[in-house]
Amino acid sequence: MKSPIMLLHVLLEELGSQCGVSTSRDLKTIAARVEGEGESFLTLTLPQFCKDLEKGLEQGRVTDDLWTGFRRNSQTGLPRFLGGFLRLVFNDGDGRLLDDASPEALFAVRQTCLFFSKIELPCTPKRTQAAFDRFIQTEMEVRDADRNWSADSRDRFDRVSRLLWSNLFSRVDNQIRAAGVLPKHGPGQTADRLTGNRKFNQSLWTSRLEDVFPARENVVPSDHPRYWEVLEGMSVLSPGDELPVRVTDVPKTLKTPRLIAIEPTAMQYMQQGILEVLNTEFRNDDFARDLVSSDSQLPNRRLAKQGSYDGSLATLDLSEASDRVSNQHVRHLFRNYRDLFAAVDATRSRKADVLGKTIRLAKFASMGSATTFPVEALVSCTVVFMGIERGAAVVGLPCPGPDSTLDWERWDRPRRLTRRDVYTLLGQVRVYGDDIIVPAEYAEFVTEELESFGFKVNLHKSFRNHSSRFRESCGAEYFRGVDVSVVRCRKVLPKSRADVPELESAVELRNHLFHRGLLRSADWMDERIERLIPFPFVEWAWDETAQDYISTSPVLGRHSYLPCEAGKHDRWLHRPLVKGAVVVSKSPICRLDGIGALMKFFLKRGDTPLEKDHLERSGRPQSSRVKIGWYPLR
């Protein structure tokens, strides 16, 4: 960790110079704590320091329970570590949040503390085991929430879900009834360990799938007798014999791994088809498009910025959101739509293999199921509006005023939400995964409603205070209208050209530092990367097709907003070239022919042709390498 510490020193010095703060004592503290505590100071202790800072922002003042692991000023409670920055955010006399608190100083503290918070390092076996224990514990809590779900709450859930999604679900239901689900194989692993082209020769189906999605309509090109032999060779599993999802851990942070559930091939195959139908209809539905569409995170970020500017919107964060969506919630959500209900239920795995032990699932699905994300959004958004309905009986509803501003319509008595009310709230409520945005007046009611359904609101990452106006959603953070989002180091720095994932991450880190205006830190990264590969400037320009800024060259390069100088010109194509490195990889050999190859053709989406060797190689590459050469600059 020597090089990362050096980078952190450069970064902290640069942040100090931007804010006019001396950081010499802070640098000594970091060096001493890392020597005594190891890398956990950077990956665990400093992120906790930032959590305490954000708690102080939400409270509007410093309290005694903050920064307990650091020496503090006895009068104000401010820690001495990074104290120069914190005095620009909190009053040095009484610890209250300053009216003119510096967004730059806040960014400096957060950037320093969170720089290594998401670095991918393997957890200790103890922490990994704790993650699996939490998975089991969450499953038990979902069962408890199901038992405590009152009849009144169920009726309200049914009514609000019909109000929000009846048109959407009717269209999806009709699409499924008309055999409009086109299955699709995902790129990842499956519980039966089929990869690449082998998935097109699947030999397992389930009786539950057969009732809704017959194999003759989804596994073979047609019901022609020539394919009967394939169907007869398939094993159709009864519900008791179905393969469980395989729960496994993948690196996330040093604090805890991420747990995902790897689905069986047949389930994932049909889940992808349902997901495609849902996403298409989301875009066509007035409510779903504005409330739960997953096409972009930008709407959430814009609303978070608005909330930080005027305090009108609160940002809520759910912990273990996908693992806390009960299957009972989903069954009630879809129960009036026969074909949609049957399709979602047939493609849901009922059992999970957790460290060799098979358990029956009360949750709908974990991360790994293709339908988890949209179904989670639909359920949680329904509960959010239940909370808003309850809160509206107390604080009223926003309504358009004569000058197109929002006034508040007071209710004389409790009443039910109407479609007009929902239209009024569009642009103020949005759900993206575990990130929720609601009007600040309803935040407390929504939180209570979510928790009554078994969801767990992470209060350390939820913000609604009007005076502090710090908001966070979908990876973007804002303070009083100013973007204070931080750059994170995701992987250890590369030592050689052979460390391809680390090299790609280092280039990405360098460019993120550049875009955040941390030019000295970006220069430090330039020096290290140039020792390993040619590292030219490449243009960072707007692309109309992608509707975003992208690099105009395929090489690993440093972004520039200015036109870049070419190393030479292509004599045949007359285009500028630059010498640089590109990452090349090959999919593993996985040959496919016969009926499976024909199905791959029929299931293809879009106009882009398949790779010429797609029947010879398929699946995620197992390794990659860096290739040096001359490549187009633009």
Model regions: which residues?
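Short helix/loop capping segments that flank catalytic or ligand/cofactor-binding pockets
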Residues: 258-260, 270-272, 323-326, 481-482, ...
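Conserved polymerase palm-domain catalytic core
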Residues: 308-432, 437-453, 460-477, 491-498, ...
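Glycine- and small hydrophobic-enriched segments that form the cores of compact globular domains
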Residues: 227-237, 241-243, 248-252, 256-258, ...
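Active-site-proximal segment of RNA-dependent polymerases
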Residues: 261, 265-315, 385, 401-412
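Extended, charge-rich low-complexity interaction segments
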Residues: 486-513
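C-terminal, non-catalytic extensions of nucleic-acid polymerases
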Residues: 1-257, 402-414, 511-634
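Conserved PLP-enzyme active-site core in the AAT-like
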Residues: 293-300, 446, 453, 479
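Conserved pre-motif C helix in the palm subdomain of viral-like polymerases
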Residues: 240, 244-287, 361-391
